[in-house]
């Protein structure tokens, strides 16, 4: 760094350029021996055609041409171009509007179908909820009947034992849960 800032020896040309551009060169880079003509990116760039401005003489940075005669566009052709472009945009807008209207119509149809299906499913769910409630009541009754049956099964032997302890004249008929028709047959 001392050679760049305050050395009395003459600096190298690269360092002079760097000093003039306020760039400090720390180490010179290595030059690659790359063949640019075979680079695919360069080949693609070379294949791009060059374009000229519509109004020659008004290139970037020029505010007013001095001695050159400007080429002017024919206003009738520009008007035709603009009208054609306007017609094209109008056709595109009509196509988009037609497609949008078709989509809106289809969305409304789908909304109606979904709403109908949703209300049908809600009614079905309510019906199944009622069925589930009735099944729950049946399950509760079944549990109550099982408890009653267990109570009877425990009570009948005690009744028979108590009945057998009574004198024969005071004994009751044997207890049966079956209806009279089943006993007689």
UniProtKB/Swiss-Prot annotation:
Residues 1-20 are annotated as: Disordered. One of its GO terms (cellular component) is synaptic vesicle membrane. It is found in: Lysosome membrane. InterPro entries: TBORCS5. CDD domains: BORCS5-like (cd22789). GO terms for biological process: lysosome localization; organelle transport along microtubule; positive regulation of anterograde synaptic vesicle transport. Keywords: Lipoprotein, Lysosome, Membrane. The keyword ATP-binding does not apply. It holds the Pfam family LOH1CR12. It is a lipid-anchor. Belongs to the BORCS5 family. As part of a BORC-like complex may play a role in lysosomes movement and localization at the cell periphery. Associated with the cytosolic face of lysosomes, this complex may couple lysosomes to microtubule plus-end-directed kinesin motor. PANTHER family: BLOC-1-RELATED COMPLEX SUBUNIT 5. This is BLOC-1-related complex subunit 5. It comes from Gallus gallus (Chicken).
């Amino acid at each position: 760094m001392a050679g760049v800032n305050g050395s009395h020896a003459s600096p190298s040309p690269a360092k002079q350029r760097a000093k003039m551009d306020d760039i400090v060169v720390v180490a010179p880079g290595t030059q690659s021996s790359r063949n640019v003509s075979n680079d695919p990116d360069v080949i693609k760039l070379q294949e791009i055609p060059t374009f000229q401005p519509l109004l020659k003489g008004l290139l970037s940075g020029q505010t007013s041409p001095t001695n050159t005669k400007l080429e002017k566009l024919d206003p009738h052709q520009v008007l035709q171009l603009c009208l054609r472009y306007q017609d094209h945009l109008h056709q595109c807008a009509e196509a988009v509007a037609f497609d949008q209207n078709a989509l809106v119509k289809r969305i409304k149809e789908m909304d109606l179908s979904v709403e109908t299906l949703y209300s049908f499913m809600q009614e079905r769910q309510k019906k199944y909820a009622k069925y589930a409630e009735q099944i729950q009541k049946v399950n509760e009754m079944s549990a109550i009947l099982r408890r009653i049956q267990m109570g009877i099964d425990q009570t009948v032997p005690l009744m028979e034992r108590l009945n057998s302890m009574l004198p024969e004249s005071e004994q009751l008929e044997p207890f049966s849960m079956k209806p009279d028709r089943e006993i007689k047959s």
